[in-house]
Amino acid sequence: MILIGVVFTGDPRMQQVFRGNYGKAVRRGGGVPVFLPWKPEHAAFWAKHLDGFLFTGGGDPDPRYYGQSMRPECGTPTPARDEFELALLKAVMDTGKPVLGICRGEQILNVALGGTLIQDIPSQRPEAAGENHRDNEHRYAPDHPARVLPGTLLHSLMGRDELLTNSVHHQAVDTPAPGMRVCALSPAGIVEGIEATDGRFLLGLQWHPEAVAAVEERMQRPFTALVKASKEHKAQH
């Protein structure tokens, strides 16, 4: 049994659909999802006893964690979630266990490891204004292109140079953290994916594959790969 910790999104209106989408993607990949409340004091316990981790989408991380003042366009942070996720990531990094981050999950992974974010794409990267980064209408209908860089883990998983992604965000990775590299880019150069440079399974995706994984086999692959990597790590330790 491979136990995958899945961080709660926190929005009561979205809990059922997010639990369903994320949980079903983990189950289809052969894992058992364990949904994690925002309790920093439990981070070390989860890091020790679970096999892999899925950091989910949600609101904007507090810019102070990456050394910036908050811009007017930045969303209101959720301190409890920031504190829990940063504590959990710190504990997980010490174990070497696999991590997959989706949307906010990619962003908080980058922040936890020392990277920075674009707080608001429309105001800070106007050249990307036409890429529909907050297109809620297309959450379940991939139509946003992303170029997958050759020689990356993501490229080996997806088997394509370009993907059509469903994009619902206004923030993105700016400077990748030390030990992380860009693995996917939008046409305007917005980071759509990051991964570890040392070969361990640390993968962040800016789009929402969980929303379409039930009908698009390729979008299921990151979740299946997370479970596989978690199983392999467990067998080796």
Language-model regions, residue ranges each:
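N-terminal beta1-alpha1 cap of cysteine-dependent amidohydrolase-like domains
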Residues: 1-100, 111-112, 118, 122-158, ...
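Active-site-proximal beta-strand elements of phosphoester/diester hydrolases
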Residues: 203-206
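Conserved G/P- and acidic residue-centered "switch" motifs that form tight phosphate/ATP-binding loops
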Residues: 103
